[in-house]
A protein has these predicted regions:
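Charged, low-complexity intrinsically disordered segments and flexible loops
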Residues: 1-115
Length: 115
């Protein structure tokens, strides 16, 4: 059965439950985005640019997740949100490249300080 209001697939009860979960998931994406934006405001230009790139990844992940139409997806995969939004970001190859670049710059900076 499909709920015409949400266009989500599943029984009426599944769709109702999934819509509640979906609202919570969207709120979690908002919370994580707010934290990254707050952090970015305190960073220097290069690091801020990287954090803004992470925000782009976050919004792409949000669109991907929120675009799912199967009630079962939200019920099965998102019932317990926890750190799932952060994990989606951390597993992204672009985030891994940003992290690797940061670590490389940190090592280079430490080596320069040591002389």
């Amino acid at each position: 059965m499909t709920n015409d209001l949400s266009a989500m697939n599943g029984t009426a009860a599944q769709v109702e439950r999934a819509e509640r979960i979906k609202r919570d998931v969207n709120a979690e994406f908002d919370r994580v985005a707010t934290a990254f934006r707050s952090f970015a405001r305190r960073q220097e230009d290069a690091r801020r640019a990287e954090t803004e790139a992470v925000l782009v990844i976050l919004e792409e992940k949000r669109a991907e997740v929120m675009g799912k139409q199967e009630a079962g997806y939200f019920i099965h995969d998102w019932q317990e949100i926890g750190g799932q939004v952060r994990q989606l970001i951390f597993r992204d190859a672009r985030y891994q490249a940003i992290k690797s670049n940061r670590e490389g710059r940190r090592r280079w900076s430490e080596e320069r300080r040591r002389g």
